[in-house]
């Protein structure tokens, strides 16, 4: 059933001066109840502030998590998702069991 699928559209966004940010996988559709792992990596910069956003159908971007350093993660919205930052330029978004309310487009950003 279409309603039981979670669609994630991810992309690669480019910064300036050879600085890049990559999200992996680029596109993902997961059924409700399955696990999730999305990875964001930044190249060409050090000590970036990293952010995970979600855009649900018909809504604007919602900040989910932000991190100012390794192991320093703040959550804006309590939910079924979690984030980890195992390395300076890596930020991982995950869920052990997706809910229908997790549906949306996910975007990683840095500053």
Swiss-Prot record:
Signal sequence interval, chain numbering: 1-18
Any one Pfam family match given in the protein's UniProt record, by short name: V-set
Keyword annotations from UniProtKB, A to Z: Adaptive immunity, Cell membrane, Disulfide bond, Glycoprotein, Immunity, Immunoglobulin domain, Membrane, Receptor, Signal, T cell receptor
Chain positions carrying an annotated carbohydrate: 80
Cellular localisation: Cell membrane
SUPFAM superfamilies: Immunoglobulin
Domain Ig-like: residue ranges: 19-111
Cysteine pairs bridged by disulfides in the record: 40-108
A biological-process GO annotation: adaptive immune response
Gene3D superfamilies: Immunoglobulins
GO cellular component: plasma membrane; T cell receptor complex
Function according to Swiss-Prot or TrEMBL: V region of the variable domain of T cell receptor (TR) beta chain that participates in the antigen recognition. Alpha-beta T cell receptors are antigen specific receptors which are essential to the immune response and are present on the cell surface of T lymphocytes. Recognize peptide-major histocompatibility (MH) (pMH) complexes that are displayed by antigen presenting cells (APC), a prerequisite for efficient T cell adaptive immunity against pathogens.
Subunit structure: Alpha-beta TR is a heterodimer composed of an alpha and beta chain; disulfide-linked. The alpha-beta TR is associated with the transmembrane signaling CD3 coreceptor proteins to form the TR-CD3 (TcR or TCR). The assembly of alpha-beta TR heterodimers with CD3 occurs in the endoplasmic reticulum where a single alpha-beta TR heterodimer associates with one CD3D-CD3E heterodimer, one CD3G-CD3E heterodimer and one CD247 homodimer forming a stable octameric structure. CD3D-CD3E and CD3G-CD3E heterodimers preferentially associate with TR alpha and TR beta chains, respectively.
Protein known as: T cell receptor beta variable 30
